Amino acid sequence: MVPLVNEATSWNQGTFFGSIVSSEKTAAASGTIGELRRDPMAMLPFCGYNMADYWQHWVDVGKRDGARLPKIFYVNWFRKNEQGGFIWPGFGDNSRVLDWIFKRCDGAVEAVETPIGLLPTLDGLNLDQLGLSEDAIASLLRVDADGWMAELPLIEDYYASFGEHVPEELKEELEELKRNLEAVTVNVA
């Protein structure tokens, strides 16, 4: 569902996406290794207080007078093909994605606006000599609007588990994501 890389359009959008990160369980977390679970900002096993309060801290960082905020990027090195294999080669080739990120920070490459943020253009990401098919590249950079729409109720339930602690700004980002996805769904149909 998550593309290879995307850039948040705002600090709050980046914080929102950080708050809903999912990853496979590892030895650092209890449960079945390999099972998918929410791991906000990849900090759940290490955060000693309510995660929604932690998110509020990051929202507040963005409100500080004179704050020079970095861009926020979201990566998915582990997108799988229909056969269950990883599409992206990983390892040293991850530097190709980092190269695009650095160029975005410098304003040296363009991006495509999507409901979930900004994605690389086909010519902005160095894919030379990777041997990836056009279908594989399209899959890596595809925004699965239907998958995201199916995820929205799960995110709402997840946020509800934190009660009144969830920052209003993140609830607003969730609503904006919903509107953006609905607009795409309407345009495609």
Regions inferred by a protein language model and the residue ranges of each:
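Conserved NTP phosphate-binding and transfer environment spanning the P-loop NTPase/kinase superfamily
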Residues: 1-188
